UniProtKB/Swiss-Prot annotation:
Pfam families: EPSP_synthase. HAMAP family: EPSP_synth. It is an enzyme of class 2 (transferase). This is 3-phosphoshikimate 1-carboxyvinyltransferase. It is found in: Cytoplasm. Its EC number is 2.5.1.19.
Length: 427
């Protein structure tokens, strides 16, 4: 297996223009495909997860042109649901939850038979709450291997709407997927959320993009969503993909630990992504943060431990776990049960790897506490085919200790040139 050893970084300083957001890119691509008219997406993320979505759309008959650097995509929308004349068209979606879940819902609207599959880890990531909701709305979906998990076989029969319950406690992607399909149902859909809805800011991203594509939804305090029937997505013409706020977290944290200062552009006060709130968590730890409409600047600060509920920003919360290695006291990251069903079981993985560098760690069912050692140890970090594990643990190099990252290429899921960008900021 390939590995990368990062030598100690004495200072971080500079500016980074963020790659496009994964969450925004894949949502916008799907809606552009369903819309009538042409959409030009700019600052599209070039990564594995986006490639899986693009490959699926091509197989589904969507005509698009991708620029040479893969950041501009012109999509000629179908103006209707997907159709397949191939018997059981198979779509391989890697480990891309942002492709698997929304496509599972969207394909129920169309005509034909579809099989959705992916990498072994994808077959361990739950999808049962979404499938149950789709079936309640009239969909024909079956599990091909294990109950509640991909791969799925879908027969396009349309969605009839009605009253549907969705469990919101594991992943907001189930609700996102259903919301994006519901406007094309034959009857009005009322979606009732069962349990506490996790990652609410990701639902805001979904609703914002749907509105941009001309669809109306009534949100009743995130408990009930009413979606009028027989709507159509309309191409907005130009669509700028915001920078990826989760990806910004590593550079903002690096500046807080070892700045100088770092300015990240592509997100800011006007961002639709909840993960920009990571900067508030850094500020609570003692970093100095400046906000613009489309940029955030972080300066070095004396960092102290925090005890915080991170249910709203679970992805960016991972960066707090390794930032905690540089903070005084014990940091507690709470209410992140859904770490367990992400690219890997992130609570177990994070606890294991933090202990390798010398931290004292308590891993609970839905929380983790981290007490840093007096001095970090040089360790070889396993990344579990999880892009965020690799990027989070790169921050260890901001100490006086090197760090070795196994399988650094796993960052290609969302940020293929992450380590190059980190090097550019290292003084």
């Amino acid at each position: 297996m390939e590995s990368l050893t990062l030598q100690p970084i004495s200072k971080i300083d500079g500016q980074i223009n963020l790659p496009g957001s994964k969450s925004v890119s894949n949502r916008a691509l799907l809606l552009a495909a369903l819309a009538s008219g042409k959409t030009t997406l700019t600052n599209l993320l070039d990564s594995d997860d986006i490639r899986h979505m693009l490959n699926a759309l091509k197989a589904l008959g969507v005509d698009y042109k991708l620029s040479e650097d893969k950041t501009v995509c012109e999509v000629n929308g179908l103006g209707q649901a997907f159709k397949s004349t191939t018997e059981a068209l198979e779509l391989f979606l890697g480990n891309a939850g942002t492709a698997m879940r929304p496509l599972a819902a969207a394909l129920c609207l169309g005509e034909g038979e579809f099989i959705l599959t992916g990498e072994p880890r994808m077959k361990e990531r739950p999808i049962g709450h979404l499938v149950t909701a789709l079936k309640a709305a009239g969909a024909d979906v079956e599990y091909l291997e294990n109950e509640n998990y991909p791969p799925l076989k879908i027969k396009g029969t349309g969605l009839k709407g009605g009253n549907v319950d969705i469990d919101g406690s594991i992943s907001s992607q189930f609700l996102t997927a259903f919301l994006m399909a519901a406007p094309l149902s034959s009857q009005e859909t009322t979606i009732n959320i069962v349990g506490d809805l996790v990652s609410k800011p990701y639902i805001d991203i979904t609703l914002d993009i749907m509105a941009t594509f001309g669809v109306v939804i009534e949100n009743k305090e995130y408990k009930t969503f009413v979606v009028p029937a027989n709507q159509s997505y309309i191409a907005p013409g130009e669509f700028l993909v915001e920078g990826d706020a989760s990806s910004a977290s590593y550079f903002l944290a690096a500046a807080a630990i070892k700045g100088g200062s770092v300015k990240v552009t592509g997100i800011g006060k006007k961002s639709i992504q909840g993960d920009v709130q990571f900067a508030d968590a850094l500020a609570a730890m003692g970093a100095e943060i400046e906000w613009g409409d489309d940029y955030v600047i972080a300066h070095k600060g004396e960092l102290n431990a925090i005890d915080m509920d991170f249910n709203h920003i679970p992805d960016a919360a991972m960066t707090i776990a390794t930032t905690a290695l540089f903070a005084k006291g014990t940091t507690s990251i709470r209410n992140v049960y859904n770490w367990r069903v992400k690219e890997t079981d992130r609570l177990a993985a994070m606890a294991t790897e933090l202990r390798k560098v010398g931290a004292e760690v308590e891993e609970g069912e839905d929380y983790i506490t981290i007490t840093p050692p007096a001095m970090l140890r040089h360790a070889t970090i396993d990344t579990y085919d999880d892009h965020r594990m690799a990027m989070c643990f790169s921050l260890v190099a901001l100490s006086d200790t090197p760090v070795t990252i196994n399988d650094p290429g796993c960052t290609s899921k969302t940020f293929p040139d992450y380590f190059d960008k980190l090097k550019e900021l290292s003084v």
